[in-house]
From Swiss-Prot:
Species assigned in the record: Paracentrotus lividus
Protein name as it appears in the record: Histone H2A
Binding partners and assembly: The nucleosome is a histone octamer containing two molecules each of H2A, H2B, H3 and H4 assembled in one H3-H4 heterotetramer and two H2A-H2B heterodimers. The octamer wraps approximately 147 bp of DNA.
GO MF, one annotated term: DNA binding
GO cellular component: nucleosome; nucleus
Amino acid sequence: MSGRGKSGKARTKAKSRSSRAGLQFPVGRVHRFLRKGNYAKRVGGGAPVYMAAVLEYLTAEILELAGNAARDNKKSRIIPRHLQLAVRNDEELNKLLGGVTIAQGGVLPNIQAVLLPKKTGKSS
């Protein structure tokens, strides 16, 4: 007796929903958060997969831009300042995260045109 019931087939190895969808973000955890968050009475099977994919895409986009900002500043480690520069210099991400404050992010370098010294070019 192998304890496998009547079928006698060996049980296949469990495969996570994240690996089935080809994602790094945890589909099961997103599903749990959707259920516990009281967003709706019921949550479909595809909803957490789609949401995990969207979150993974946005994270990858921000990390790529922040990595470029870190490389521009000759740094090998991404700090909150690099995240701030990445988000605020990208038009779409800036619109999406318009009301978000990034701690230790600072501000974009910007000098108003009226504060710059006057151009006194002599053309004679």
